[in-house]
Amino acid sequence: MSQEWKEYAKRVLDEWQPKTKLGMLVKEGQITDIHEIFRKGYQIKEPEIIDVLLPEVNARENQEILDIALTVRMTDSGRRVRFRVLAAVGNRDGYVGLGIGHGREVGIAIRKAINYAKLNIIEIKRGCGSWECRCRRPHSVPFTVEGKEGSVRVKLIPGPRGLGLVIGDVGKKILRLAGIQDVWSQTLGETRTTVNFAKAVFNALYNTNKVVVTPEMIERYGIVVGRAMPASFTLE
């Protein structure tokens, strides 16, 4: 964590009045590593938790607006127009979140989407599962995973170093925020539906956590959970 983001986390910590048990644990310094939250199965309900433990997701390059749509709903008083925004955030090193926000103004909808993405942040497994590579570096997925949303199916397949991201643009943005650099993919369904495609990619990344790995697999594929190089979370 750079000094700039440590200072940002300190400011959030000083001004923040937590409303949940997890928030209090973070505020009191009893939890100082985001990995501990996922290891213990806590649910994140306050975006400030991410602002303190993973402040670098607030950098402009670590936030992506994936889709902006105008929705119209008929009410007794007439047509009601609102914006719907799909956003993703990540630290480019094992953590990524996806969120949808609504609002009468696009700026409000964007802020809501980013906050929801923070609340939905997940920790993923990375590694080198490609038989063409075997470098044991966390540049790809360690094994094939599949995600589904609506009619869309996305399969992420380990790729060798230097391959890049062989997937649609929305998928590329999410994978980069997660810290995935090389991957093959297979897609089925109406992938032009941005929301479903993004959620399917996100679900595939989440499913890396459902595979039970052995010490032999960790050694063979260089599997890491979350950050590849744990940062210092001391805010002193």
Swiss-Prot record:
One of its GO terms (molecular function) is structural constituent of ribosome. InterPro entries: Ribosomal_Su5_D2-typ_SF (IPR020568), Ribosomal_uS5 (IPR000851), Ribosomal_uS5_arc (IPR047866), Ribosomal_uS5_C (IPR005324), Ribosomal_uS5_euk/arc (IPR005711), Ribosomal_uS5_N (IPR013810), Ribosomal_uS5_N_CS (IPR018192), Ribsml_uS5_D2-typ_fold_subgr (IPR014721). GO terms for cellular component: cytosolic small ribosomal subunit. This is Small ribosomal subunit protein uS5. PROSITE patterns: RIBOSOMAL_S5, S5_DSRBD. Gene3D superfamilies: 3.30.160.20, 3.30.230.10. Residues 61-124 form the S5 DRBM domain. One of its GO terms (biological process) is translation. It comes from the Archaea. The N-terminal domain interacts with the head of the 30S subunit; the C-terminal domain interacts with the body and contacts protein S4. The interaction surface between S4 and S5 is involved in control of translational fidelity. It holds the Pfam family Ribosomal_S5_C.
